[in-house]
Amino acid sequence: MGRRRQRVDPAAGARAGALPEAIAALSRSLPSGPSPEIFRRAKFDRPEATSALWQLLFRVLSPLPAGNALASLALEVQARLVKSALCSQGYPRLALAQLPEDGSQGSRELLLALSWLLARGPVPEQMLAQARVPLGDEMTVCQCEALASPGPPAPHMEAEGPVDVRHVQWLMGKLRFRWRQLVSSQQEQCALLSKIHLYTRGCHSDQSLSHLSVTEAEMLRDPEGGQQVSGAGAAQNLDLAYPKCLHSFCTPGMGPRTFWNDLWLVCEQPGLLPGDWAAPLDPGGASACSLLSPFRALLRTLERENQRLEAVLAWRRSELVFWRWMDTVLGTCAPEVPAAASQPTFLPWVPERGGGELDLVVRELQALEEELREAAERRRAAWEAKAGGCGRGPEWSAARRASREAVEKELGALQQCWERDGGPAQPHGPHRLVRREDGAAGDRDLRAAVVIRTLRSQEACLEAVLRRLQGQCRQELARLVGARPGLIWIPPPGR
């Protein structure tokens, strides 16, 4: 008798096939994402998946460029940074802090931490926005204070001995020179950018932009700005402008959309160009340089960005399948003890041999606290006695007037911040620079005059704070000079 064939549910088969596709889409959307096999092994807490997940969490929590020195840290250092970053963000599971940092175990716990980050915010979209290729001329406009910089903080260096004042003055002069250099380079860049936008007006197929960006203008340079490509004989100056021979093969026009399409066709089929143009593109020819190598690299980068965007869209479509699978992963974990809810989420490890030193530090801190309290009481009593003796003198009136003005300024600044926070959302993030003659602006557009006016007001506030701090420094220097009778203080000339 033949074996009875088992009936297969098509819906169950589709659900089983959707899970690998969802995990593969998530892997492609993350920076240096591991293979889907790593996720499967992490579900069963296999140790070979631990190092890849530590590195993935480090890339997600510290979005650094690939060439950065911090991106090639040791696995132990990356694990410590991941632990501190998750602790600062409020990760609730205590088991992560107890994992070894050598990558020997804990892949399932790392998978849970990654899913916690995915549930808190759009991580793939954030990674895609940080690594996107800007084709337009952009400027970052941000009127909010940066609370923290991405990545671990820079190490703080202390001077080993006394520092010469002349060395400090030399450093200040060097810093001032570099600052002026930066400002002049920014002004020159803005002038060149304005010329490019003015000269390429009307060349863009998108009527809302009307002009080309620097990247697009680089693709359409004039013959005088062409590259020098060494051929078999003498060097020849090739025209990198739009080749006229492409008009018979490709779509006509100088718009960037047709230009990108035609450029891709040229990269794929160099035979469309005449001999002078096709020789540098022939990989088997005598030319050592490729004319369109920057173009080809840019197109490949855009292709990779499009692939990541498609992966993010595929991940969003199959996200529910992944979360159902994560429910099964969470079900295989041992439940945490109830007493851990009242404990802090992160407990630093303290060696046993340092217990005596820690007690000594505690006693020293308590003694220092008592001294500070006594000094504060003495200073408060002296201030009250001084205020009671000169309550109606001119010095007291001037001090009271200065204090009132300072308090009014601080209150005015706080009130402006409060009104600004309660009003419409402030501009944040990169904005594309567009030159418009008609002056029309959309709802989400930001005028340059508004940004300049805001920056000037912020500059005035910062200058006022700088003058106040400089006055405090002069008073402190005068006090130090008065304490040393043999010291001659020659202030620098006014700038």
Curated annotation (Swiss-Prot):
Alphabetized InterPro entries for the sequence: TEDC1 (IPR043535), TEDC1_dom (IPR027996)
Subcellular location: Cell projection, Cilium; Cytoplasm, Cytoskeleton, Microtubule organizing center, Centrosome, Centriole
Domain of life: Eukaryota
Any one Gene Ontology BP term: positive regulation of smoothened signaling pathway
This protein's record includes keyword Glycoprotein: no
GO cellular component: centriole; cilium; cytoplasm
Region span, Disordered: 417-440
Keywords: Cell projection, Coiled coil, Cytoplasm, Cytoskeleton
Alphabetized Pfam families for the sequence: TEDC1
Coiled-coil residues: 355-387, 452-480
Outcome recorded upon mutating Q269R: Found in patients with primary microcephaly; uncertain significance
Principal location: other
Subunit details: Interacts with TEDC2. Found in a complex with TEDC1, TEDC2, TUBE1 and TUBD1.
Function as written in the Swiss-Prot or TrEMBL entry: Acts as a positive regulator of ciliary hedgehog signaling. Required for centriole stability. May play a role in counteracting perturbation of actin filaments, such as after treatment with the actin depolymerizing microbial metabolite Chivosazole F.
Descriptive protein name: Tubulin epsilon and delta complex protein 1
Organism: Homo sapiens (Human)
Gene expressing this chain: TEDC1
